């Protein structure tokens, strides 16, 4: 019996020994890795965000500086003449000239400007036609007939015939027996008016006159 107790005590002691080993094994903490200096990865540098450069503002260009035209010529002076005062006495003398057949057709050519300046020859021509209106001796070629005859020569109604030969040619075309050819000559400030009455058939000068024209 003592032998059995000893065996039981030995088994019990061995069991206690094993349980203590197991307990120590279970209580050991898990190994912890220590951080070693110098092994950390370097931080990646932050890439700069690219920026778009701003476009500089272009300043508004000033407009061209306007200068008054220094080369422009002054407007020509407008002159007014007493055409009627010069023409009435001359027309009266022409109507009394020798060799003029009453009732004949008369072509009044435009007054030609032969002065050294600019004057309104159209105004002079109109005044001359008015001075001859209802003269009792000549029948005037109408302005419409004269305009048509000028157009046949390639001229405008306002154009002067410019020469005696052209005036005579148109007079024949319109059936006129006489032509009154007139020129303004000399200084434009104090022009002279020359008038010639010509016979279309022969070109003979039946009458001529000259008078001074004053400015108004």
UniProtKB/Swiss-Prot annotation:
Regulator of peptidoglycan synthesis that is essential for the function of penicillin-binding protein 1B (PBP1b). Residues 28-77 are annotated as: Disordered. Residues 1-20 form the signal peptide. One of its GO terms (molecular function) is enzyme regulator activity. It is found in: Cell outer membrane. Keywords: Cell outer membrane, Cell shape, Lipoprotein, Membrane, Palmitate, Peptidoglycan synthesis, Signal. The keyword Transmembrane does not apply. PROSITE patterns: PROKAR_LIPOPROTEIN. It is a lipid-anchor. Belongs to the LpoB family. A lipid is attached at residue 21 (S-diacylglycerol cysteine). A lipid is attached at residue 21 (N-palmitoyl cysteine). Transmembrane segments: none annotated. GO terms for biological process: peptidoglycan biosynthetic process; regulation of cell shape. Gene3D superfamilies: ABC-type transport auxiliary lipoprotein component. Interacts with PBP1b. Coiled coil: none annotated. GO terms for cellular component: periplasmic side of cell outer membrane. It comes from Enterobacter sp. (strain 638). This is Penicillin-binding protein activator LpoB.
């Amino acid at each position: 019996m003592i032998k059995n107790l000893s065996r039981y005590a030995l088994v019990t002691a061995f069991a206690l020994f094993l349980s203590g080993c197991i307990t120590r094994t279970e209580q050991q903490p898990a190994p912890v890795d220590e951080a070693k200096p110098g092994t950390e990865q370097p931080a990646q540098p932050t890439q700069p965000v690219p920026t778009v450069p701003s476009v500089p503002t272009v300043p508004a260009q000033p407009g061209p500086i306007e200068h008054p035209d220094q080369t422009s010529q002054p407007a020509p002076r407008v002159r007014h003449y007493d055409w009627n005062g010069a023409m009435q006495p001359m027309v009266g003398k022409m109507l009394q000239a020798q060799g003029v057949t009453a009732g004949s057709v008369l072509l009044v050519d435009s007054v030609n400007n032969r002065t050294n300046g600019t004057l309104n020859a159209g105004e002079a021509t109109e005044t001359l036609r008015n001075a001859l209106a209802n003269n009792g001796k000549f029948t005037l070629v109408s302005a419409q007939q004269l305009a048509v005859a000028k157009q046949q020569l390639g001229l405008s109604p306002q154009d002067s015939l410019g020469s005696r030969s052209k005036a005579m040619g148109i007079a024949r075309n319109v059936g006129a027996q006489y032509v009154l050819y007139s020129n303004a000559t000399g200084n434009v400030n104090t022009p002279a008016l020359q008038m010639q009455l010509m016979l279309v058939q022969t070109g003979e000068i039946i009458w001529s006159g000259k008078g001074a024209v004053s400015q108004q």
